[in-house]
């Protein structure tokens, strides 16, 4: 399943011209964070065992249907479902779509956490993994240069503002609910302080 999901990322990145700050390397990083959070939560929540494919696939695919990167979110979701259909059940695909279409920072800040039923912890694992990956200021710079065509110095300046206004507030905004993410975010927060 993971091989197919990463293949999907490579194909969608090319097809939709998704910049490198949200492509394969980012998907790999979010998947690694999600795997660590999953392992840390499994002992307390053994029901997660049946949701591992949902968590890992969501972590890998989370940006491939985002309206910031694709012109038609519904079409991208349909294509992703078709691409992954031989590797995941319809129920798993439904859960993945519910997670990846509601986990963005802006949606959470605006609407709070969605009701994803039995997948609540899976949702938080994937969402937190993506937030942890945001502690890389170079990704912000790359996004500014690639997508917004900013000069390096301007992209650095904007990235610094984004870090202060958003990333460095993740902890005080209470966006981490799992213990592993709380500890890792503190480590990343302290090493990323601007």
Each predicted region: which residue ranges?
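An active-site-proximal "capping" alpha-helix that borders the catalytic cofactor pocket
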Residues: 30-35, 72-86
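Hydrophobic, well-structured mid-protein blocks that either form specific transmembrane helices
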Residues: 79-115
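His-Asp-centered metal-binding catalytic motifs of divalent-metal-dependent phosphohydrolases/nucleases
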Residues: 50-72, 76, 97-106, 130
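Divalent metal-dependent phosphate-bond-processing catalytic cores, especially two-metal-ion Mg2+/Mn2+ enzymes
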Residues: 16-47, 61, 108-194
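Short alpha-helical hairpin
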Residues: 1-13, 35
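Short helix-terminating capping/connector loops at secondary-structure junctions
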Residues: 45-51, 91-93
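Alpha-helix C-capping/helix-to-loop hinge sites
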Residues: 15-19, 37, 41, 64-67, ...
């Amino acid at each position: 399943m993971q091989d197919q999901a990463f293949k999907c990322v490579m194909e969608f990145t090319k097809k939709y011209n998704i910049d490198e700050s949200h492509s394969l390397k980012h998907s790999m990083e979010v998947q690694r964070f999600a795997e660590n959070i999953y392992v840390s939560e499994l002992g307390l929540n053994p029901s997660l065992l049946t949701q591992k494919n949902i968590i890992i696939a969501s972590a890998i695919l989370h940006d491939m249907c985002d309206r910031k990167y694709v012109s038609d979110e519904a079409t991208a979701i349909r294509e992703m479902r078709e691409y992954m259909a031989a590797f995941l059940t319809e129920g798993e695909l439904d859960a993945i779509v519910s997670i990846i279409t509601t986990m963005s920072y802006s949606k959470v800040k605006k609407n709070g956490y969605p009701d994803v039923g039995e997948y609540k912890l899976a949702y938080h694992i994937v969402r937190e993994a993506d937030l942890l990956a945001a502690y890389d200021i170079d990704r912000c710079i790359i996004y500014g240069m690639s997508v917004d065509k900013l000069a390096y110095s301007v992209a650095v300046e904007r990235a610094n503002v984004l870090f202060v206004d958003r990333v460095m507030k993740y902890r005080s905004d209470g966006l981490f609910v799992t213990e592993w993410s709380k500890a890792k975010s503190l480590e990343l927060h302290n090493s990323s302080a601007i």
